[in-house]
Amino acid sequence: MIIQISNRQEDFQIDDELTSDIEKSIRICLLQELNDDNYEISLSFVSESEIRKLNSDYRDKDSVTDVLSFPLDDDFAIQTNLLGDIIICCKRAIEQAKEYNHSIKREIVYLVVHSMFHLLGYDHIDESDRIIMRNKEKSALKEIGIYKDEEFK
């Protein structure tokens, strides 16, 4: 498993402990879904201005969001084992962590898991798809050791 991490923001320090938790969460998602972790993912931590621009350019939404997922074309991903890109806005993740009363590390791990399932082909546009994706997230988070309203160990 290869995870290319790029930190292009100054709102939160991406330390070794968080990096390890991120690697663990990505591996769990891959093993649960594909029974294989021989994939490459790009993960970028960005500022509000950068994620707003990406959201505007690729989704026609001129707003800050917490996370964006850019899966690669299925045929290309299968041939190369490249799944795609995850872009996280740390400032927005900090705000959400406060809102939900848990740590920023917990929020970032959740956002990584959520985004991984987008890279793996899931979505939450309609209710039935949302339920399927949410159950996948819950299963992965449980294996990681994150439960609703709790910190992970």
Swiss-Prot record:
<keyword id="KW-0540">Nuclease</keyword>
<keyword id="KW-0690">Ribosome biogenesis</keyword>
<dbReference type="GO" id="GO:0005737">
    <property type="term" value="C:cytoplasm"/>
</dbReference>
<dbReference type="GO" id="GO:0006364">
    <property type="term" value="P:rRNA processing"/>
</dbReference>
<dbReference type="InterPro" id="IPR002036">
    <property type="entry name" value="YbeY"/>
</dbReference>
<dbReference type="GO" id="GO:0008270">
    <property type="term" value="F:zinc ion binding"/>
</dbReference>
<keyword id="KW-0963">Cytoplasm</keyword>
<keyword id="KW-0479">Metal-binding</keyword>
<feature type="binding site">
    <location>
        <position position="118"/>
    </location>
    <ligand>
        <name>Zn(2+)</name>
    </ligand>
</feature>
<dbReference type="GO" id="GO:0004222">
    <property type="term" value="F:metalloendopeptidase activity"/>
</dbReference>
<dbReference type="Pfam" id="PF02130">
    <property type="entry name" value="YbeY"/>
</dbReference>
<dbReference type="InterPro" id="IPR023091">
    <property type="entry name" value="MetalPrtase_cat_dom_sf_prd"/>
</dbReference>
<feature type="binding site">
    <location>
        <position position="124"/>
    </location>
    <ligand>
        <name>Zn(2+)</name>
    </ligand>
</feature>
<comment type="similarity">
    <text>Belongs to the endoribonuclease YbeY family.</text>
</comment>
<dbReference type="GO" id="GO:0004521">
    <property type="term" value="F:RNA endonuclease activity"/>
</dbReference>
<feature type="binding site">
    <location>
        <position position="114"/>
    </location>
    <ligand>
        <name>Zn(2+)</name>
    </ligand>
</feature>
<keyword id="KW-0378">Hydrolase</keyword>
<keyword id="KW-0862">Zinc</keyword>
<comment type="function">
    <text>Single strand-specific metallo-endoribonuclease involved in late-stage 70S ribosome quality control and in maturation of the 3' terminus of the 16S rRNA.</text>
</comment>
<keyword id="KW-0698">rRNA processing</keyword>
<protein>
    <recommendedName>
        <fullName>Endoribonuclease YbeY</fullName>
        <ecNumber>3.1.-.-</ecNumber>
    </recommendedName>
</protein>
<keyword id="KW-0255">Endonuclease</keyword>
